[in-house]
Design a protein with these regions (language model features):
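Glycine-rich, low-complexity intrinsically disordered segments
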Residues: 1-144
C-alpha cells in the first residue's frame, strides 16, 4: 500500500478557456453554508433552532508576475458592461511529483471584479506581481 502524505502547495496549474496560465499564488478557495436561526413562539425551549441556509462562495484571487505586453487581466476586466459580462470557467489543479492532478477545484461562471497592478518601489528588489480577483457562482472539488 502506498504511503499517504500531505501534499505540498507549490506545484499547481490554473487554466481558463483551455489556456494554462502560470500563477505564483491562488487564494480564496472557500465555500460556506449560512446558518438560518428560527424560533416558533410555541417552542418549549427558550432558544432558536439552526438550519442550513444558502451556500456562499468567497472571491478567488490569483497572483502572477507581470509580463511585458500581456494585458489579459485588464482586457478581461474591460469587457464588463452593464448586464454583459464575459464569464469563464477556471480550473485549478494541485499536482503530485509526476505532474498529475490529485485535487482539482472547478470554479464556475467566474468574472473579474478587481485587477491590481504591482506595487512599485524605487528601492525594491522583487518581481512585479499583479493580481486578479474573481467572483463566481460555484466551486466544485474533485479529489482523486
Amino acid at each position: 500500500m502506498p504511503q499517504q502524505y500531505p501534499l505540498p502547495v507549490f506545484h499547481f496549474t490554473v487554466q481558463w478557456g483551455g489556456t494554462r496560465i502560470g500563477f505564483s499564488e491562488v487564494s480564496g478557495l472557500t465555500q460556506e453554508n449560512q446558518a438560518i436561526e428560527y424560533r416558533d413562539g410555541s417552542f418549549p425551549e427558550y432558544s432558536s433552532i439552526k438550519m442550513p441556509g444558502l451556500r456562499k462562495f468567497s472571491n478567488v484571487t490569483l497572483k502572477r508576475g507581470v509580463v511585458a505586453a500581456d494585458n489579459e487581466f485588464f482586457n478581461w476586466l474591460s469587457t464588463i458592461r452593464l448586464n454583459k459580462v464575459e464569464r469563464r470557467d477556471v480550473v485549478i489543479a494541485l499536482l503530485n511529483e509526476e505532474h498529475a492532478p490529485v485535487m482539482v477545484w472547478k470554479i464556475h461562471n467566474a468574472f473579474p471584479v478587481k485587477v491590481e497592478g504591482p506595487q512599485l518601489k524605487a528601492s525594491g528588489n522583487e518581481v512585479a506581481i499583479e493580481s486578479i480577483e474573481l467572483a463566481h457562482e460555484g466551486l466544485e472539488l474533485q479529489n482523486d
